[in-house]
Structures are given as C-alpha cells and as structure tokens.
From Swiss-Prot:
This is Endonuclease MutS2. Residues 710-785 form the Smr domain. The keyword RNA-binding applies. Belongs to the DNA mismatch repair MutS family. MutS2 subfamily. Homodimer. Binds to stalled ribosomes, contacting rRNA. It comes from Listeria monocytogenes serotype 4b (strain F2365). It is an enzyme of class 3 (hydrolase). Endonuclease that is involved in the suppression of homologous recombination and thus may have a key role in the control of bacterial genetic diversity. Acts as a ribosome collision sensor, splitting the ribosome into its 2 subunits. Detects stalled/collided 70S ribosomes which it binds and splits by an ATP-hydrolysis driven conformational change. Acts upstream of the ribosome quality control system (RQC), a ribosome-associated complex that mediates the extraction of incompletely synthesized nascent chains from stalled ribosomes and their subsequent degradation. Probably generates substrates for RQC. Coiled coil: none annotated. GO terms for biological process: mismatch repair; negative regulation of DNA recombination; rescue of stalled ribosome. Its EC number is 3.1.-.-, 3.6.4.-. Gene3D superfamilies: 3.30.1370.110, P-loop containing nucleotide triphosphate hydrolases. InterPro entries: DNA_mismatch_repair_MutS_C, DNA_mismatch_repair_MutS_core, DNA_mismatch_repair_MutS_sf, MSSS, MutS, MutS2, P-loop_NTPase, Smr_dom. The gene is mutS2.
Amino acid sequence: MEKKVEAILEFDKIKKQLTEFASSSLGEQAILELAPATDFQVVQKTQLETEEGAKIIRLRGSAPITGLTDVFAHLKRLEIGGDLNGLEIYQIGSNLRVSRQMKNFMNDLLEIGVELPLLGALSDELLVLKEVEEDIAISVDESGKVLDTASEALSTIRRTLRRTEDRVREKLESYLRDRNASKMLSDAVITIRNDRYVIPVKQEYKGHYGGIVHDQSASGQTLFIEPQSVVDLNNERKALQAKEKQEIERILAEISASLAAWINEIHHNTFILGRFDFIFAKARFGKAMKAVTPHLSDAGVVHLIAARHPLLDAAKVVANDIYLGEDFTTIVITGPNTGGKTITLKTLGLLTLMAQSGLQIPAQEDSTIAVFEHVFADIGDEQSIEQSLSTFSSHMTNIVSILGNVNQKSLILYDELGAGTDPQEGAALAIAILDASHAKGASVVATTHYPELKAYGYNRVHATNASVEFNVETLSPTYKLLIGVPGRSNAFDISRRLGLSENIITEARSLVDTESADLNDMISSLEEKRNLAETEYEEARELARGAGNLLKDLQKEISNYYQQKDKLIEQASEKAATIVEKAEAEAEEIIHELRTMQLNGAAGIKEHELIDAKTRLGNAKPKTINKTIPQAPKQKPHVFQEGDNVRVLSLGQKGTLLNKISDKEWNVQIGIIKMKIKTVDLEYIQPEKPKKQRIITSVHSSGSPAKSELDLRGERYEDALQKVDKYLDEALLAGYPQVAIIHGKGTGALRTGVTEYLKNHRMVKSIRFGAAAEGGNGVTIVEFK
C-alpha cells in the first residue's frame, strides 16, 4: 500500500487518535508502525485479535497492562556485561509483575470458558519469573532507591548511619538552645555545607566553637562552622555513607547479574506485552468510535451498512450504505460540487485501510469490506470552479501511474475525473479511463460533475450511477448517497426558491432540449421511489433486528433455565432435608425425655405411640434428587437422518434434526431454538400423521441488553438501591461474570449503602473498589458466583 494514498486518505490521523488509547510507549511504537496488510489471512488474524481484545474489554472493562515500560535498552546493557541503576531494575521488575498479572488475568478468562484462541496463545508465551520479580520488589522502589530490605548489611549500615546523624543533630541543637545562641549565631538552624552538618556563626564569635569553617555568607558576616565537638561524628557519618554507597553498588551489580541470566525471557515478555497493549488500544479505539468488526471478502465485495467517516463529528456525520463488487464493479457519482461526493470516496478508502490494518470500522453489524492488494486514489482540491492546466497535468500524471500498476485486486478512487480541461474532451477522457480501469479488473468509484457520464452507468453492465441527495427546500446537500440514481441539475428549483422570476425560469426550460428535461424528470421520480424504498427497508431491518434480539434473549434464558433447574431442585431438597433433620433431632430429644418420664413411672404414654411418632418424622424427610438422563428402552438403534423427529432426553423436549456435526453430535431445532445435542441424548420419535396447523408470527422488540456497568451518580439513596437490585438481576440474566457499579466518591454514604447491600446479596461472590484505571473508590467491581 502506497504511503501517498495513506496520506491522501488521512490514515495518519487515525493512527494519531489510536495512540491516545495506548498504555505504554511500546504500544505507541506499534501503532506508529501500523500499515494496512494485503494478505487476506493476515487481515483475518489481525481482525480476530482486535475482536478478542474487544470481548475482553466488554467483559472486564480493562486489562492489567499499566506499568509496562520499554526496557530493551536496559537489556542491551546487560548483554554487554553492564550494571543497571535502581530505576532501570525497578522498570524490569514492573514488566515482570505485569507479565504475571496478565497471564493470571487471561487464565481466569479462559477458565470460565471465554473463547480467546489468539490472545490465549499469546498469553501462553508469557513466562512468570516470580522469584526474580520478588527479589526486585524487596530491593528497589519505584523511584529507583535501593531499600533497606535489599540486604541485612545495608539495613545495619543505614540504622547506624541514622543513629550517628541523630547524635550530630542533637549536639548541634544543644548549641542552638544555648542562652547565648541568639547573640553568637546568625540564625537558629542547622544546615549542610560540603555534605557536613554546620551552624551559622557570626564572624566575631568564630573562635568560640572551634572546628572547621566550611563556607561563609556573601557579606562575610556569617561563617558556616562545623564545631570541633561534632567533627569526629561527621567523619563517622561520612565513612558510613561510603559503606552505604559501596553496599548499594554491590546489590545493584548482584541483581544485574541475576537478570542477565533471563535476558531472552524478559525481552520476549516485553515484546508480548507490547502486542497486548497494541491490541487493547485497537479495541478501546473501536469501542470509543462505536465501531464493529466487519466481514471480510476476498472477492472484491463491499457492503457497508451505515458507514461513517471516522474523522468527522459522529453526531453530525451522515451515515451511508456503500456496496460494490456483486452486481457492479464501478460506481460513477454525479452531481454538483460541495455535495459530499469526495467524502464518500474518502469514507470507502479510509475504512478499507482501517480494516486491512486490523481496526474495527464505524458502520453497522454485518457490514462487509473487501481486502485489496492496492488502493489507489486521485483526490485533490477540486472544489474551485477554475481549473488550471497544471492541475489537469498533475491529475493525468497520477492517473497514468495508477493505470500502469493496477490489477484485479485493486480499488481505484477517482475524484472529479476528467476535470481541468475542455468539458467535452474531459468527459470523453473520463469514459475512456473508466473503461481502461475496468479492463484491468479493478473496482472503481469515481466522482464527476459532467452530465455526459450519467449515461455511463446505463451503457455498461459492470457500472452503476450514484448521486448525493440535494434538498431544494433548504438549498443544501443532505450528504445522503443514492446508489442507482444519477445526479440531476437543481438549477431551476434553486433559482425559483431564491426568487427568480417564473417567466425567466419558463424561458430557460424551453431552451433545454426535451431529452435532458425528460431525463431530469425521470431522475426526480427515481429519487422519490428510492427514498420510499429505503424508508420501508429501514423499518423492515429494525423489525428483523428486534426479532433477532428476541431470539438471542430466548436462547439465553432457555439455556440458563435448563442449566439451573436441576441444581435449584437439588438445593431445595437439601435445604428441606436439613430443616427436617433439625426437627427430627429435636423430636428425638423430646422422645428421650418422655421415655425417661415413663421409666420413672409416668402413666399414659405407650411405647408404640413413641415409635409411631418417630417413624412419621423420619418419613417426612425428603430424599435428595439425583438427576440423571432418562435412558431409552433397549431396542435396535435407529440410524438418525436429517429431518427426523427426536426427543432430547436431558431436556424432555421434542425437536427436529437439522444437520449432523459429527457421529457424536447433531444440530437440533427445538421450537425456535437451535442447539447442539449429543447423539446419546437423542431418542427417535416415529412420525405422526401430519395435522393442519395455523402459524401465527409475532415480532416484539426486545429490551436493550444489560450493560456491564450501572451509573448511580446523582441518584437518591433509596432509588439507587432499587436500581442496584433490578440491575443485578438483569446482569445475571445477561450472563456477565462481573459488573461495575459507579457511585462516585462524594460523602461516601451512597458507596457505603451499596457496599452493605452487595455483601448480603446471595449471588455476589466478591466486591472490591476499582483500580485507578477503573475509577478508583468511586466504582465498585462486583463478581458473581
């Protein structure tokens, strides 16, 4: 892919936005090196990586990547036998910590059944060096300072040094407290000169304290003197400082030597973590842009649904459907300038580059985009009315280069094709260039304001016309792309709206040839029919989306029901048994007391009555239900075939075999639900005489699925707890393993109330405040059982 095309389509601006989502310089560097791939399998892999990253962000909100640092230069120094300083060692330790946390994080996701084939394999490459990490953690802090816990010798030296410094300060403070201090000292402070503790003495009293003069004030009136009484203590202090420095150097050298044995492993861990940071940055970028993972085509098929230009304001940009490569391979967009034709070209081109770089694209679900070997673009500033020869020459030079390199795996974007020269010659050139591009097998989208090219889409089976809608009421373009409808002139309508005399407009219409007038009327009619069809299509698509959501909800609820049913029955039976056992024990005690009374001579209590009472209590105890799959009666096994009616033994439901997955498993249609069922769990049902049935179809719009977070900021206390209760039910039904509840920091009352409520909820496994990247103690993370 040419860098020139990336610049024309502003792919560099996308990369700049993407860097804002990286957590480390390693992620940023990977983004700067990002370029569109042209190999179909490579693009598939990078898209799947991003999709897996997005899945993790949806489930967990974030990943433990904070603290990752570029340590490759540190490892280079270790390779040549050099020692690292404390900060460099800490940064390596931080990377080891992130490696361990990331591996544990990924293992937790994999253990609960989250499918992450690519990122799971990437996680497997991380090596946990727990002992090395711990050695660094007890040796240096985040500022690079060597800690007392690094060695016993260092701890002893520093303890002795602190005591010595205390003795020096105590002695000097005694001078400051002396009753003559105000007379002999310039200021009652202890300071340091030449790394020695000194006091500021007035010039005339320098002989009173003896010792060494280390400095004097600018005026010479104050001398900074180390009194003779602390010289020896200061000397001892200096000696201890030298020992401390020597021990620190020994510790750093020792740790550096131990790290040198793991250079390759640390290098690989850092590289893998950089990949994770890059992938999560792509995922977070896609989430912020409300983007989707597109289907990929290796056959030049593009079908973008509600595609938006990613660099324009999402609240204002007009989304358009763009399709190419099935019924036609060339689109000619006609119509006046400033109508949004160029934005359409750039949207298609930029989304292609993004998709081939492994980025999600701003469009709706089920959008398809092609993977091209080459993307060519001849797009310039063609908005001015006057075109110079130099501009025409520049465009033609570019087009010559494009036609010399294009192949059948190419996408060409021509903006204002043939502009800058005589209109008649320019239109003829444009047609010839489009034919030449098609002959090379390329996919082409071209814009032009030449009316002569309107016929191109009708005269060529591989081509179609398109236009950008214009609202004559507001005298402005709507930026809505209309594929299949050529652009028409709006000059008469605009003139009438602006107040031009109707007589002039009528005369002007009479000067236009009948064929052109009829063509404009036909285009106008096409636009109206197209708008009506699009409205009906959108309504149908919305209904289909609602039906799809309903089906997903039902599938999830039915699956959860069958999974939980037996468990709930057994739990209820066990609880009932516990209650009865307790009652039985109490009854046993009562019976024992009654028997004792009988032995002591109490009358009226029969032995058989006691036995009967105990037997009745024992029979009241329910037995724990052990649910097993009912076994079909032994008979000659039936050879299952597609279309057979069957009973699913574990569910007690009837269904129909759709297709065989393997000898051990079938796809079975159970009502409106399609499920994978093991062959041993199926029982053949003899076909019954068909009965006439009345089929009633009803589509209801399902509610929005529960989000992974609940925002309570600004809510009253009682209302907030009600919302939490309802939200937890929705989140459990949606299958989230954990959710985030945002309550803010404030006075802490809401946070405390929410925390107490969560502690007593039967389905909550654990709660914790969010990490810094998750919102700190303004957010509570809830993990379900």
